[in-house]
């Protein structure tokens, strides 16, 4: 730690692990909804599948704008206390996020319109609290380190944490829910346990991570939601990353939402979901561990594109030959191994675009950049929640009965073809239009530091003249 150059200064292992714990916690709360809420709506609340899709669409569009609000709040902060610029939002938003994550899985006996209204309101409230918590958590990376390799490692730890959270949700939620003879009670109790666990991990993150580089917003700069949009369109690398992420997150979430239906009705073994989750998430963890080394050897963009190729190949193989349990798990592992590199680097690339924006405009606005980026992610999540609900209705899905051949074929297309097509679009977008490579990034950081040193020298000279 004797090296004080921000570009080479290294973080200790404890802080990296603590940062990764944040995404364990947030994903324990988020992924129970991503994976099981649509099924809870259709099978427990008795909603038509398209009702669930509309709820996802409305609530996720709402939370896209709450992300922008979070960015506005972050960039508006002037007096930064000892807790830092971002950490207080993690501390205070984790409680309502955990509480509402549980309430979403409590069944009611109201009529369908009332059930739908309650479900929509709860989903929107969860989105608001989750935005305050998770956007602050993600936007914190530039304040933790300026070392690009350390940022890649933090992103890898974050993706590792997200993978562990997703793995636990995939492997443990249904077995926990099945312990109860009353399925509705099982959903509520399982959600409660996951929410408590998520809250604990968020607190471990809060206590273990420090903000080492807190840049206050310039006095003449006023944050606004409009500026979050402008931060995207005035920042070409960020815009390209947003478009690619729109595709990758939609593909990933569609796959997660449909896999519970696929294992139950196509493979006739819903318990296979736990085994598939165990092996495929294990492959993701291996991929995440390889991210720092592969990035160091080949660069972020090349590793990102290689991950996209693996993802697409795994889905194509599964569509044609994934009709039994063994091949489904095996080819899913290939696809999820590819997603490890893609999802890790989605986060590692965002801090680089923050620095690009500062270099281009002279204003450092982590909140606006990050929440502009997450706005696209929420739009993607809205579509990923809406499309399965609508498509389940279109293919003739009826809960808790044997499905027709047309419905089974529709499920296969939903879980494999749609994600594969979106992955290919994302790969083409990044391959042709993302130009912020490692060499250019180093030059940008060097120029930013030169500007700051020049400004400091000017201020010191002015102060000495005044005295």
From Swiss-Prot:
This is Putative sulfoquinovose importer. Belongs to the sodium:galactoside symporter (TC 2.A.2) family. It holds the Pfam family MFS_2. GO terms for biological process: carbohydrate transport; sodium ion transport; sulfur compound transport; transmembrane transport. Disulfide bonds: none annotated. Disruption phenotype: Mutant fails to grow on sulfoquinovose as a sole carbon source. InterPro entries: MFS_2 (IPR039672), MFS_trans_sf (IPR036259), Na/Gal_symport (IPR001927), Na/Gal_symport_CS (IPR018043). It is found in: Cell inner membrane.
């Amino acid at each position: 730690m004797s090296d004080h150059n921000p570009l080479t200064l290294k973080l200790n292992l404890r802080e990296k692990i603590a940062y990764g714990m944040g995404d364990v916690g947030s994903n324990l709360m988020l992924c129970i909804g991503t994976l099981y809420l649509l099924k809870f709506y259709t099978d427990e609340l008795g909603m038509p599948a398209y009702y669930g899709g509309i709820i996802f669409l409305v609530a996720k569009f709402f939370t896209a704008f709450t992300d922008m609000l979070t960015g506005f709040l972050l960039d508006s902060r002037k007096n930064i206390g000892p807790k830092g610029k971002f950490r207080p939002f993690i501390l205070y938003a984790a409680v309502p996020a955990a509480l509402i994550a549980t309430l979403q899985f409590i069944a009611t006996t109201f009529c369908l319109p009332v059930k739908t209204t309650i479900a929509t309101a709860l989903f929107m409230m969860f989105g608001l609290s989750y935005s305050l918590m998770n956007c602050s958590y993600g936007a914190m990376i530039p304040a933790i380190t300026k070392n690009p390799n350390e940022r890649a490692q933090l992103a890898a730890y974050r993706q590792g944490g997200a993978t562990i959270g997703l793995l636990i949700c995939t492997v443990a939620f249904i077995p926990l829910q099945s312990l109860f003879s009353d399925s509705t009670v099982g959903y509520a109790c399982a959600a409660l346990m996951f929410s408590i666990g998520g809250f604990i991990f968020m607190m471990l993150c809060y206590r273990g991570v420090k903000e080492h580089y807190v840049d206050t917003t310039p006095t003449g700069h006023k944050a606004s939601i409009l500026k979050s949009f402008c931060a995207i369109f005035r920042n070409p690398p960020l815009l390209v990353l947003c478009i690619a992420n729109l595709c990758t997150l939609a593909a990933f979430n569609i796959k997660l939402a449909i896999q519970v239906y696929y294992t139950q009705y196509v493979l006739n073994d819903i318990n296979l979901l736990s085994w598939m989750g165990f092996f495929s998430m294990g492959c993701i963890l291996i991929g995440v561990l390889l991210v720092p080394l592969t990035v160091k050897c080949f660069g972020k963009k090349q590793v990102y594109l290689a991950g996209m190729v693996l993802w697409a190949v795994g889905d194509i193989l599964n569509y044609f030959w994934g009709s039994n349990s063994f091949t489904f798990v095996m080819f899913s592992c290939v696809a999820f191994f590819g997603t490890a590199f893609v999802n890790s680097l989605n986060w590692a690339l965002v801090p680089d675009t923050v620095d690009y924006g500062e270099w281009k405009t002279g204003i450092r606005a982590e909140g606006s950049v990050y929440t502009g980026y997450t706005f696209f992610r929420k739009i993607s999540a809205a579509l990923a929640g809406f499309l399965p609900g609508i498509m389940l209705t279109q293919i003739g899905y009826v809960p808790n009965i044997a499905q027709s051949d047309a419905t089974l074929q529709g499920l296969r297309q939903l879980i494999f073809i749609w994600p594969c097509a979106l992955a290919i679009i994302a790969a083409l977008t990044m391959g042709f239009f993302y130009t912020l490579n490692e060499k250019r990034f180093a030059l940008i950081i060097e120029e930013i530091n030169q500007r700051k040193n020049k400004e400091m020298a000017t201020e010191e000279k002015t102060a000495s003249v005044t005295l």
